[in-house]
């Protein structure tokens, strides 16, 4: 109820000055914030575009800044949605975790999947995107951490247009790992200005645990 009231109060305040709002909350697959925003928007009779990112963290920030840039360019709401939606639909996040128990406890991964991974000593490469409906799922399973890292890099390089894709390497207190991935991508030709390193937000890090690396990527043409 506290979250509902905070969103309600914010929307009431925004309604005084704006006729259209873009909201970029945590994906529907991990949170009810988006549906709460839609419900409040209907109640207050507001024109709110709630964007489902099918993701978290850096991609939310990227799209919010992108929308602001398009607004400053005097794009209409329809034009903005037409520009950003294909990029969102094709965006992806790969997740490499040290310990699956955090995801299991938080209900983000089934106990069976976590137990099987531990028993077989495998390293799952997780992903979250439109195809997973914004939920964390297993993309592949390999035998060593080094192979998991290599698989993630190869998968991303196969997916992207290196000149027009932004790669966000986010981590939970594992800067050394993030720097390693950045070096790998630059060596493969990704422009350094298209690679960004940041922390995983705390609301997500409590589920992933320390030492996690997530690599998020989205296409944006100038």
How would you name each of these model-derived features?
Residues 13-21:
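Glycine-rich phosphate-binding loop signature in dinucleotide/nucleotide-binding domains
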Residues 20, 29-39, 43-49, 55-222:
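Mixed-charge interfacial surface used for oligomerization/domain docking
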Residues 1-14:
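Glycine-rich oxoanion-binding loops at beta->alpha junctions
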């Amino acid at each position: 109820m506290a979250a509902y009231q905070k969103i309600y109060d914010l929307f009431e305040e925004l309604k005084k000055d704006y006729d259209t709002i873009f909201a970029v909350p945590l994906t529907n697959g991990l949170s009810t914030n988006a549906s709460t925003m839609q419900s409040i928007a209907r109640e207050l009779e507001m024109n709110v575009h709630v964007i489902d990112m099918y993701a978290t963290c850096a991609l939310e920030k990227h799209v919010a800044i992108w929308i602001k840039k398009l607004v400053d360019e005097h794009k209409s709401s329809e034009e903005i949605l037409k520009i950003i939606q294909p990029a969102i639909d094709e965006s992806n996040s790969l997740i490499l975790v040290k310990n699956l128990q955090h995801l299991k406890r938080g209900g983000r991964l089934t106990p069976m999947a976590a137990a099987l991974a531990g028993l077989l000593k495998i390293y799952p490469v997780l992903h979250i995107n439109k195809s997973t409906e914004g939920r964390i799922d297993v993309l592949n399973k390999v035998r060593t951490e080094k192979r998991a890292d290599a698989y993630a890099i190869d998968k991303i390089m196969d997916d992207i247009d290196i000149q027009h894709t932004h790669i966000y390497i986010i981590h939970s207190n594992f800067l050394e790992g993030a720097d390693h991935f950045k070096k790998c991508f630059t060596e493969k030709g990704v422009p350094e200005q298209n690679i960004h390193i940041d922390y995983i937000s705390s609301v997500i890090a409590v589920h992933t645990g320390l030492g996690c690396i997530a690599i998020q990527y989205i296409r944006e043409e100038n």
